[in-house]
Amino acid sequence: MSIVVTGASGLFGRATVAGLLERMPAGEIIAMTRQPAKLADMAAKGVDVRQGDFDDPDSLERAFAGAQKMLLISASLVGKRIPQHRNAIEAAAAAGVEHVIYTSYVGRGDDQNASLAVSDHRGTEKLLRESGRRWTVLRNTQYTEAVIEAQAPHALRTGRWIACAGDGRMAQVTREDCVACAIAVLTTPGHEDVVYNITGPELMSFRDIAAVISEIAERPIEYVVVDDEGMYAFFDSLGIPRDASKEEVVNGIPWSSDDMVSVERAIRLGQMEILTDHVQQLTGRRPQSLRALAWARRDELRIAG
C-alpha cells in the first residue's frame, strides 16, 4: 500500500513522513512538496519525493499516481483553500487514490460558525463527500504550539494578553498528537467516512491559558478583553495583514487578523467549545495538555521578550 502525503516539507507533513517511516517501507511513502530539494534527507532514506503544487492540477495527478491513500494537509490561506483543495481532490480521483484523509478544523454550527477557517474547511469536507472517494476528516483544534510560540511571547514581553475571545473556551491540542492521529488513520483499518474531532484534554479560555503561562514563566500577565475592533487594532500594531489571503508566517504559523479575529469571535460565541477522547481512541494515549507542553518549554517562556 502506497501513501502520499501533501505538503510534506511543512512541519505537519515532515513529522507525518517521519512517523510513517517507522511503520512501513520507505518506498511505499510518497512525499509531495512544491520544492523537492527541501526533502533531500527523506529522499536519501528511500522516500519517493515528488513535486506537486495545489495551484497546478497536472502536477498533482503525477504526484498522486500509484497511491492508495492520501493525507491531504490543508493549505494555509483562508479564501484560497477551497479551489486548491478541489484541485487536489479531483487529481486524487483521476489518479485512482481510494481514500483521502483530510486535516480540517473543529467548530460547531458549520455554515453559522463565525470563523472564516471553519467555512473553508466545511467547504472542503463537502467536496470530499461528493468525490466518490472514501474519506476521513480530522478536525484538529488550535495547536498548543501556536499559543506557546506565537501568542505567549508577546504577552510575556508586555504583561498583557489581549483577546476578543472573552471567556469562551477551546481544547488546544499539540501538533504531535494531531500527527499521531493522522498516522493511525493512515496505517490502520476502519476509519472510512468518519469525522474525528482531535482535541486536547481540557477546555480552556485564554484567561485560563494566560494564568498558566504566567505561572510557569514566573512573570505577571493581565488578561485584557477587547472587542473585535480592538483586536484588529492590536494585530495592526504588530504589522499583521488583515487580508486572510496574505497571511504572515510567524514561527511557521500563518497569521492574518481577519482569520484570527473570526476564530476568537467563534470562541467567544461558544462555537469552538468541543472536547473529545478521539486522540486516545486513535493513538491509545491521552493527549498532552497545554500545561505539560508549557512546562516542557518553560526555559523558552522564561526568556521570552
Model regions: which residues?
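A short hydrophobic/small-residue beta-strand
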Residues: 49, 99-100
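Residues lining the SAM
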Residues: 6, 73, 284
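A hydrophobic C-terminal alpha-helical subdomain
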Residues: 229-305
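Redox-cofactor binding/interface segments in oxidoreductases and associated redox assembly factors
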Residues: 69-73, 102
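Rossmann-fold cofactor-recognition segment
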Residues: 43-56
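Oxidoreductase cofactor-interface core, primarily capturing Rossmann-like NAD(P)-dependent enzymes
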Residues: 1-38, 55-58, 63-65, 76-83, ...
